[in-house]
């Protein structure tokens, strides 16, 4: 498949499982593109991005959320895989072919986003903001996406990038280092024996939502949080990140037990920033 074949012309409407809906909703008159990175070569969970979770392929979860957000104008899957591309198209997303060198186990997602934004700019796309939604974090909600975009575009702040975080299960002061079989606290001044309530709280970066100004994306580097980053907090129930078979089974359990549905009505967590 070629980039020309996969990058569809821009149009005011898109057919999706949610019906035909306008793509003219904007934030402060600025266009927003949702990017879903989904390569075909997962090794820990083979064919992970097209594996069914809760009745639909994993890659469709972020597509549906993007379609439900009134802030997002285009939803584009970047992939090297024909089956993923076909699944994305059938569910109302556009597709851009990812070069093989950007789809290896060692490839960085930021490089795939650089390729995508360069392709979009060459195609005449003038969007100001990009939101990345990884399929491996399926339980994000529209509120999570909109909270990141609202923080990114808040006139009272100057963030160039925003991402979702969740409270870590383990305090950073309870991490250990083991050198030649000898354990020691990972942080020199930490006391891992103190009760949990007396330990500092740490936060984990999730794969649920990243949002940034397209023109602020650095030409080099590995981080998707740059310049003055902001954070949106989300509950752990929505922050499930599927990297292993055990993670997938856990996500299935949340659905089977109805835990995800019950938690899905929670308000998006508070926002935080570096300043």
What is each model feature region?
Residues 71-76, 160, 237-238:
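Short active-site oxyanion
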Residues 20-46:
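N-terminal nucleotide-binding beta1-loop-alpha1 segment
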Residues 27, 111, 202-275:
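Conserved alpha/beta core of the MobA/IspD/sugar-nucleotide pyrophosphorylase nucleotidyltransferase superfamily
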Residues 2-6, 11, 16:
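Low-acidity, Ser/Thr- and Arg-rich intrinsically disordered low-complexity segments
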Residues 82-131, 139-150:
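Short phosphate-binding loop-to-helix
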Residues 111, 138-228:
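Conserved core of the sugar-phosphate nucleotidyltransferase
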Residues 58-74, 86, 90:
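A short, N-terminal amphipathic alpha-helix
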Residues 51-52, 77, 132, 240:
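Conserved SAM-binding loop
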